[in-house]
Amino acid sequence: MKATVNWKGDLAFTGTGDVSNLPVSLDADSGTTGGARPMELIALGLAGCTAMDVISILQKKRQNVTGFDVQVDASRAEEHPKVFTSAVITYIVTGVGVEESALLRAIELSATRYCPAQSMLSQVFPIELKYEIYEEVEDGERRLTHQSAWQELPQE
């Protein structure tokens, strides 16, 4: 995989990767040019990687998922280089009759087998996994049926 960033002035860049070839705006001072900060992209990459795994596994398990979000809350060191020191990934699933065991297995498979971003980052800092399952009820409303901290991935 190859990635290239091109300087656009100040601290703004446009990046492209050789797989998607889609432009991504980067900016050291979010909001100045509308770009994301590099560390934000790492958190987004982690969220996107595990989200794709988990939803794919839930679909294969024929779970009736109507909504799915993954949130990554990453903590950073106070001193430079201000690396990530820990992260919490929260999987938020809405559906009809979504089985807790199916979600737990999907999260486990993503964390231990399929998501390279999570596998790589969990070797550098602890990642705690949490989940919420909401049952979809009438008129687009939903009610929480399961909520839990699941586990912290072991560091190798």
Report residues per predicted region:
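Extended beta-strand/beta-hairpin segments
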Residues: 1-44, 55-156
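Alpha-helical metal-binding/catalytic segments enriched in His/Glu/Asp
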Residues: 49
